Structures are given as C-alpha cells and as structure tokens.
UniProtKB/Swiss-Prot annotation:
The keyword Heme does not apply. Its main location: membrane. It comes from the Bacteria. This is Ion-translocating oxidoreductase complex subunit G. It is an enzyme of class 7 (translocase). Its EC number is 7.-.-.-. Keywords: Cell inner membrane, Cell membrane, Electron transport, Flavoprotein, FMN, Membrane, Phosphoprotein, Translocase, Transmembrane, Transmembrane helix, Transport. It comes from Photorhabdus laumondii subsp. laumondii (strain DSM 15139 / CIP 105565 / TT01).
Length: 209
C-alpha cells in the first residue's frame, strides 16, 4: 500500500514538474512572439509618419526623451530620430493635444527640421464616435491632410481650421477635435525645428530609470 502511494506521489511530482516546465516554455515563446509583433506594429506606425526611403538607420533604437510645453504637457515624450548616411533628417515625436472634446488626444508627428510635416497619426483618443473619431485613419483620411504641409512661424494663420480662418477642414458638428489636432501638430512641427541644436544633450530612452 505504501509502495503504491509512493509511486503515485512520484508520478504526480513528475507530472507537476513537466507541466510547470511546459508552461514556462509556452509563456516564454508567447512573450517573445508578442514582443516581436509589438515591435513590428510600432515600426509600421513610424513608417506611416516618416517614409522609410528618407532614412537608413534603426529608427526604433534611436529614441530620446524630451520635455516641452509645446508637446501638450510636462511629461517625457519619445522622439525617434531618422538619419540618412549618418545625418539627422527628420524625427517622429509623440505629442499630446490636451484640449480634445473628450480629453487629451495622443499623436505621433513626423516632420523634418525645416518645418515640413511628413505624416501624423492618432495613437489614442476618447472623442465621440461618429463625430470626433474622424481623426482615425480607419474612419476617414482627414489626418493625411497634414502630410507635405510646412510651418515655419507660430503666426502662420493658415494653420487653423477654416472656422478660425485657416485652411484645415473641421468636421460637421465637431470643431473642437480637429482644432485641437491642428494646433498640436503645428506646435510639434515648430518644436522639432529646434531639435538639431540640442541633439547632443538629449536623454536616450534607454537611460530612463
């Protein structure tokens, strides 16, 4: 009887060890796959705001943290630097439009250092479905209107929605959302023009504790 119980105990222990080991292996493989997919999605997002033909460096690994009121709050924002033949040519910068209709709108703005916007994407928002959510590419192509636009002065009156005398369309029944995005992209593109002179002093994302 004791021998039988001992054998059963050993069998259960071996089974438990095998199960634990298998679970650990599966979790490890799953985490690796999830991380790889996240990296691919992030690279795809960066390529939507900075055309890949413009740079030849590993843009995801050339990440810096910047703080500026122009970016919508006093929190660190990630900046991804694009280089061509070693020379900085553009950057993708996280930015916040704090004055959306339903709260802050998170953006990723790509621009060169002369004020030309290369692309903009909304990464997070809580705007009203059917109204303010037209800032999403899956809803409309409105956000693409920024590509190719240039801003060199904070006093450029073209950089406003049409209701405010500018050139950007607002949405029917929703002016606050596009106004917030236009103003945020404008501030971010202007701020990016100051980056080259401060590159040597920027904090690497990897240095953040």
């Amino acid at each position: 009887m004791l021998e039988t119980m001992r054998r059963h105990g050993i069998t259960l222990a071996i089974f438990a060890a095998l199960t634990t080991g298998l679970t650990a292996v599966v979790n490890s493989l799953t985490k690796s796959t999830i991380a790889e997919q996240a990296a691919l999605q992030h690279k795809s997002l960066l390529d939507q705001v900075i055309p890949p033909a413009l740079y030849d460096n590993d843009i995801q690994n050339e990440c810096y943290l910047v703080n500026a009121n122009a970016l919508g709050n006093n929190l660190p924002h990630r900046l991804y630097l694009a280089r061509k033949n070693g020379h900085p040519v553009a950057a993708a910068l996280e930015s916040t439009a704090p004055d959306g209709y339903s709260g802050a709108i998170q953006l990723l703005v790509g621009a060169d250092f002369s004020g030309k916007v290369l692309g903009v994407r909304v990464t997070e928002h809580h705007e009203t479905p059917g109204l303010g959510d037209k800032i999403e590419t899956r809803i409309s192509n409105w956000i693409n209107v920024f590509s190719g636009k240039t801003i060199t002065s904070n006093h450029d009156q073209h950089w406003a929605v049409k209701k405010d005398g500018g050139e950007f369309d607002q949405f029917t029944g929703a002016t606050i959302t596009p106004r917030a995005v236009v103003n945020s992209v404008k501030r971010t593109a202007l701020y990016l023009q100051t980056i080259p002179e401060h590159l040597s002093s920027l904090e690497s994302c990897g240095e953040k504790s």
